C-alpha cells in the first residue's frame, strides 16, 4: 500500500455468540471500527472527497469545511493530512476532548459552536456556522454529508459489495445523515431484493419522523430528516432510547470483548429486536464505530450517574425483547405515521 487511504474498508464480519441471541438464529456484526479512524465515516469521507476532486468542487490543496458530531471530522482530518488539504471541523459541546485532540493531531482546525438551536440540538447551529465559514474562505468545499447524494452513492457502489458475501435475511443499521444505510441498502436490494432492511434511530431524533427532543448518544439521530435518508430503502424501523443502547454497549464489552460506540449498541439492540419479534433467522448488523471514543462517557459509571442513565442487565434486556412486538413499515409509507418501537 502507498497511502493510509488504501486501508479504508474491507472490515470483518463476526458472528455474535451471546445468550441474548435466540436459539436457532444468527446475529452477524460488521465491525466498522477496523477502519483507520475506527468508524464507518472513513468510507463516507473518502467517497465525498474523491467525488469533489473529480467534479472540480474541491481543488487540490483546497479547504474542506464540515459539521460533525465526532467521527466524520476525524476521517476528513486524516484524509486532509494525507492529501494536502486544509480541514476545518465544526463541532459542539457533545464532542469529546479526545476527538478534538484527534482532529488537531492531523492538523485540522476546530471551530466550536456553543449555543444550541431553538429545539435544544446543535446540528442546525453547526450548519449555520459552516455557512459563515464558507463566506470567510472563498472556494472552500462543504461535503454536506446530510444532503450530498455522493454520500449514499459511494456506499451503494463500494461499501455494499462487502455485504454480498454472506447470506442473511435482514440488514440492520442506524440513521443520522442516512447516507451509509440508504446507500448500502440500495446496493444490496438491487441484487438481493429479498433482503429486508431495518433502520434504527435513537428516541428523540427526528430523522425518521416525529418531534425532536435531546438525547445523549453521539453519531446517531438528527433534529430533522436529511435528504440522504431515503425511506423507500427501509422495510422496518425502530426507535431505541439511550438506556437500552448504552446497556447493550456495556454488556457486549464485558461479556463478548466488543468495545462499541453508542450507535453500535443501538444497532445491536435493534438487531435483537428483529430476531425476537420477526421470522428472520439471520441478521447482519452494521456496527458504525468503536467505543474508544466514549471511554469517558458511555463507559464511565460516574458520567452515567450524572446523566441519570439506568443500565439494564442481560435478563432485563431479554424480558424487554420478548415483550415487545416488532412492527413493519409499509412500503412507500412515511415512517412518522407508523407506530414505532420506543422504550
Positions of PLM-derived features:
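PLP-dependent amino-acid enzyme catalytic core
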Residues: 1-343
Amino acid at each position: 500500500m502507498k497511502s493510509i487511504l488504501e486501508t479504508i474498508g474491507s472490515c470483518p464480519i463476526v458472528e455474535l455468540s451471546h445468550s441474548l441471541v435466540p436459539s436457532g438464529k444468527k446475529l452477524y456484526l460488521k465491525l466498522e471500527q477496523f477502519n483507520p479512524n475506527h468508524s464507518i465515516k472513513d468510507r463516507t469521507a473518502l467517497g465525498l472527497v474523491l467525488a469533489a476532486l473529480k467534479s472540480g468542487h474541491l481543488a487540490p490543496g483546497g479547504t474542506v469545511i464540515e459539521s460533525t458530531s465526532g467521527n466524520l471530522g476525524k476521517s476528513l482530518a486524516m484524509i486532509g493530512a494525507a492529501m494536502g488539504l486544509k480541514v476545518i471541523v465544526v463541532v459542539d459541546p457533545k464532542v469529546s476532548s479526545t476527538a478534538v485532540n484527534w482532529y488537531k493531531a492531523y492538523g485540522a482546525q476546530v471551530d466550536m459552536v456553543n449555543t444550541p438551536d431553538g429545539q435544544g440540538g446543535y446540528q442546525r447551529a453547526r450548519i449555520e456556522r459552516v455557512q459563515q465559514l464558507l463566506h470567510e474562505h472563498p472556494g472552500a468545499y462543504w461535503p454536506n454529508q446530510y444532503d450530498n447524494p455522493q454520500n449514499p452513492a459511494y456506499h451503494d457502489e463500494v461499501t455494499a459489495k462487502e455485504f454480498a458475501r454472506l447470506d442473511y435475511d435482514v440488514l440492520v443499521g442506524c440513521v443520522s445523515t442516512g447516507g451509509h444505510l440508504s446507500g448500502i441498502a440500495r446496493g444490496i436490494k438491487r441484487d438481493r431484493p429479498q433482503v429486508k432492511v431495518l433502520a434504527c434511530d435513537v428516541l428523540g431524533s427526528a430523522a425518521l419522523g416525529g418531534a425532536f427532543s435531546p438525547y445523549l448518544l453521539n453519531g446517531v439521530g438528527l433534529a430533522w430528516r436529511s435528504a440522504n435518508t431515503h425511506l423507500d430503502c427501509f422495510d422496518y424501523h425502530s426507535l431505541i432510547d439511550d438506556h437500552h443502547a448504552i446497556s447493550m454497549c456495556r454488556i457486549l464489552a464485558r461479556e463478548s470483548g466488543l468495545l462499541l460506540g453508542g450507535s453500535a449498541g443501538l444497532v445491536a439492540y435493534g438487531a435483537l429486536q428483529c430476531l425476537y419479534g420477526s421470522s428472520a433467522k439471520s441478521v447482519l448488523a452494521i456496527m458504525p464505530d468503536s467505543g474508544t471514543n466514549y471511554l469517558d462517557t458511555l463507559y464511565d459509571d460516574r458520567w452515567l450517574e450524572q446523566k441519570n442513565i439506568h443500565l439494564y442487565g442481560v435478563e432485563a434486556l431479554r424480558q424487554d425483547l420478548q415483550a415487545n412486538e416488532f412492527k413493519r413499515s409499509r412500503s412507500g409509507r412515511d415512517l412518522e405515521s407508523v407506530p414505532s418501537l420506543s422504550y
